[in-house]
Amino acid sequence: MLRHKTKRGHASLDCLKVFDGIPPPYDKKKRMVVPAALKVVRLKPTRKFALLGRQAQEVRWKYQAVTATLEEKRKEKAKIHYWKKKQLMRLRKQAEKNVKKN
């Protein structure tokens, strides 16, 4: 809970940014996983939890379909990027082997 009626709480709420999906300025940044914050580690199996997208839809948020399509596009781009990265790593390994032979 956040004390939104105090100046400090109001200031912290002003700093808060919440996104469903990954918006354009952040989609090109490298993402990292914090193992201690994973749902599997943090939540007990018997506890109920709620997803932000589902809650927003229940209060008549109308952009869930847009977010879903953008997320699919992002996943496709990430898949292509990962494939190119694998190809580059394979070529680099081959080049290192060729250098060691000579």
Swiss-Prot record:
Organism taxonomic ancestry: Eukaryota, Metazoa, Chordata, Craniata, Vertebrata
Listed SUPFAM superfamilies: Ribosomal protein L13 (SSF52161)
Protein name: Putative ribosomal protein uL13-like
Key word Cell cycle present: no
Biological process per Gene Ontology, one example term: translation
InterPro entries the UniProt entry points to: Ribosomal_uL13, Ribosomal_uL13_sf
Gene Ontology MF terms: structural constituent of ribosome
Cellular component GO terms, alphabetical: nucleus; ribonucleoprotein complex; ribosome
Keywords: Ribonucleoprotein, Ribosomal protein
Organism: Homo sapiens (Human)
PANTHER family in alphabetical order: LARGE RIBOSOMAL SUBUNIT PROTEIN UL13, RIBOSOMAL PROTEIN L13
Sequence similarity: Belongs to the universal ribosomal protein uL13 family.
